[in-house]
């Protein structure tokens, strides 16, 4: 039964996901981590590309979320549709515009274009926070330093006197003061450095070490290192790089002379220099004497001194953090990290914590980062923070791979560093196939999102906006250690598809194993089908059945379709190959294993990756799309459906082009998307009843079968969600690397358009959440929802303690004062929802067919419902031992 919905009932909200933010100028400044510990060291404040999150170090939970989209000022700064988006470069504790500020709940945020915002990270976000703009000409803010009430800012700029092809940056150092009378920041020039290759700041923020190149000479090896004090003249020295290179090093390869990282201690006495060869040089700045630390096999990517200079942290491609005791030359290791270490810092006034940034370079389509906060005393993990980890079909924009001694798909060598950036930019603009789709599955039981991530799977809670688990599902080198140098060419097994049975009790994965390169068998791939299960009290999935080459040697699986509940209680699935073959797998309780039950041999004389499957709810019919043919099969006989006598039933359709996806709606209509059209076929009539032209958006853009990731169906109402991505052009009509997308909601036969929404980024996937909503993911790893109901806790910043201030008491009482406070809080919630409704209705009055519709963040529909104190009477039943989150959920159920 199809539910009749009006266009105003669907709303769009961007509510979850996001990437942890790094300093965009980190390739120059060397300090990538922007996250800060609070003054009491109980909270860890970390910026994302769409929000700022505050984590409790003790409970490991996110206790506050400041979403940019929920504040007009923040959304105006960070969510503009521009090629160079605003990004956070520094967070300082307190309000720096007020001297001697003692409020521990405030932070001052600096952006790369000079915006300064003062935010409250505890309690409710102020509607109009303080906002200032530092006047910068053609400069970008790179860092901000603070010492005893004095402030310095470091900016980067392109020196116009240098050649156009010169990619080096120049620095300016300014003194920063706030004029309270004029209510503005003023800057005073302090120093300037040109052609900076690399730099780093001491952990106390008082010393700057940088390496510059002399471009006036033809000698590309002529480089110098300088160490300067930012707030006084106590330290100011410079020396050529060659003076700290041994004669043996100078005669070896360029990797032994290429500096990949640096660190300066707080006293200005020691300088650590890491090379692409893996060697670390400790330089005594008093006499330029050096000693070598050798353990790393590939490039040293990060270095940091402890506060007293007695320890050195180092990290690289080995996925191991090394802690060097400099007096004794002894080492401690923290191995088996999830990624290579691209940044390490010492945090806290006493250096109680180490912060690490890991990059999972196995995914070369995206920059996947994970932030770790470690206890310095025992190296135990206190926090592990990351967003969704999608693997896109093609490499997206702004991807930066670390430097390695070798040039591979997952790394950049010294010679290819700048060339790879230009090549990738040209490819993004000129390539015809702009396929940035990804594969995501939703668990039918707990609604968690499953992201296949090369050899592993990430389990992400959409509603809590947190990673639940990260589990390796294949056997590969990368599972237990990092790869260095030539090992980077070894390809790990890749999980290409993942499905769940309808009851959510079984997970089905399909992976491909690759043999080593440069062998006669290099093209002989191994295809593996695995069936997994887990108990409710377990975290990891357990392998039950493994099938090697299920469709034959070197025959890939092109489609997996779980069975409906009517077939073996949903514990079954279909697999299809690229030659028209079908196999039915089912769990056999007698064998206590998954077994092959039925097989349909290939019945086509050619190969195609355009394969689609659909299954009727009663399990009797299978719809098999292969190339441009759509066949109806009888499940009992596993052969082409044959009609009864005296009846005429169409059992095969021929479409205009290759079929990309097939969706069966209410066992009546079949939605078929090809390269050129979107069709609705009425099975009772045996004819196409509605059709839309998709040729300008789909033809040649997506890989065969990937259009299925951009079309989904609400199995309860029959409504269809379709995503259309469009590449933007500049004023001259030249294509750019930016995109916008449109989500269109249709009814079950495509006759009525129920919703039309525009999003400012490329949408890579959309899926139905087994309830009333559609969830989507864009290439910035942000998650959104299009649905008839949107949870207020998702669209608003997390602030449970602030919303429930009127409810917190040692004992729950019914006094008049508590009732008044409770009613006031509920009134604020209701009034905020009504304001959102008014804004949403005005937005949706626009013409749904307008091609350049502006993006609106719509925070969901609230039902007009009478709320009084009697509405909450039942909520106080069994109130003992109820957590605040559960109590808040009860409030929201009453309101919605």
UniProtKB/Swiss-Prot annotation:
Q: Which domain of life is it from?
A: Eukaryota
Q: Which Gene3D superfamilies does the entry mention? A: YVTN repeat-like/Quinoprotein amine dehydrogenase (2.130.10.10)
Q: Does the keyword Aminoacyl-tRNA synthetase apply?
A: no
Any single Gene Ontology cellular-component annotation:
peroxisome
Quote the PROSITE patterns the UniProt record gives. Answer: WD_REPEATS_2 (PS50082), WD_REPEATS_REGION (PS50294)
Subcellular localization: Nucleus, Nucleolus
Q: Mark the WD repeats by their residue spans.
A: 295-334, 490-542, 552-595, 605-645
User: Which GO molecular function entries does the Swiss-Prot or TrEMBL record give?
Assistant: mRNA binding; RNA binding; U3 snoRNA binding
**What is the first-listed, main subcellular location in coarse terms?**
nucleus
Q: Which UniProt keywords apply?
A: Nucleus, Repeat, Ribonucleoprotein, Ribosome biogenesis, rRNA processing, Transcription, WD repeat
Mention any Pfam family matching this sequence: WD40
Question: Tell me, what does this protein do in biology?
Answer: Involved in nucleolar processing of pre-18S ribosomal RNA. Required for optimal pre-ribosomal RNA transcription by RNA polymerase I together with a subset of U3 proteins required for transcription (t-UTPs).
Misc: Present with 6560 molecules/cell in log phase SD medium.
Description of how the protein assembles with itself and partners: Interacts with snoRNA U3. Interacts with MPP10. Component of the ribosomal small subunit (SSU) processome composed of at least 40 protein subunits and snoRNA U3. In the absence of snoRNA3, forms a complex with other t-UTPs. This complex can associate with pre-18S ribosomal RNAs.
Q: Give the protein name, as stated in the record.
A: NET1-associated nuclear protein 1
**What phylogenetic lineage does the species belong to?**
Eukaryota, Fungi, Dikarya, Ascomycota, Saccharomycotina
